[in-house]
């Protein structure tokens, strides 16, 4: 066999399988089947509705069967294609069943969104190891199982697909009171970066995106397992709508993106933590204790969504802060030149603060 040495390894791979490109080309949403975990409330619920409005076929997964039925009925009444799968993402067999149901119904899926998550509020030494392990089942192992199912499907078909993991600003920077949540998100961020590099090295047809939300107005705090006397809440802080996260997720479903930050707050904290770690420690020690709870008594721990499904079909929480209607930073990141200018501005601001 004659080898054309003028052709690179990447080009040879592309010739063998035209679907594999150095820059993957993802389908338009109107031509996609999208799997969304944690779809019964908050970010997942808003993303499912928005994806359906853009023409995607939706596979909604969560533990709350009643909410899933209500959601899919709502979408079908509007003329959209949607199915639901009751699943606990902390169980690998349930995650595999989500993939199998999507494939048996629609023949494939094109985007997989690992969104399901829950939090525990309390001082690190107060939270039981049992509760910590349960949170990792949902927040870390769930995305791992989802990643494996998605990558297996995309590589098996040889057609590009998107894997989108929803992280957190606390996956870039630890915080007080939510130590276990931050640890699970740190693990998810490390997993996402590692699997991305391996897949890129293998020229696998998978776009891997990590979403970094700031504080979002969802029932996240109402679902939390709380050891605090006062109710967890986004309090006295900048709060973004779940639509801003959904827009970022769906943008990444069509356009390969490495990272997307929701809110300049999320990006600024990540940068400050990397550039000035001790200063950031001090700032967060001073601010975060008081900005993560409201003044009312905490909900009973048994009402949390850590072990059982939380209330469904609610996209907003009961947070009190500076509500933003959108994230201008997220919109800017869709345009690389504008994004670079914003980042440069943040760096200059951080440097100026240091010099004072």
From Swiss-Prot:
Entry keywords, A to Z = Oxidoreductase
**Residues that hold substrate according to the record:** 168
Q: Which InterPro entries match?
A: NAD(P)-bd_dom_sf, Sc_DH/Rdtase_CS, SDR_fam
Q: Does the keyword Chloroplast apply?
A: no
Lineage, top-rank taxon, reads: Bacteria
| A Pfam family it matches | adh_short
| Family under the similarity heading | Belongs to the short-chain dehydrogenases/reductases (SDR) family.
The UniProt record lists the keyword Oxidoreductase: yes
Which GO terms fall under molecular function for this chain's record? oxidoreductase activity
User: Which source organism does the UniProt entry give?
Assistant: Bacillus subtilis (strain 168)
Name it. Uncharacterized oxidoreductase YxnA
The record's section on Gene3D superfamilies has: NAD(P)-binding Rossmann-like Domain (3.40.50.720)
**Enzyme Commission code(s) on record:** 1.-.-.-
The entry marks the following residues as binding NADP(+), namely: 37-44
Q: What are the annotated disulfide bridges?
A: none
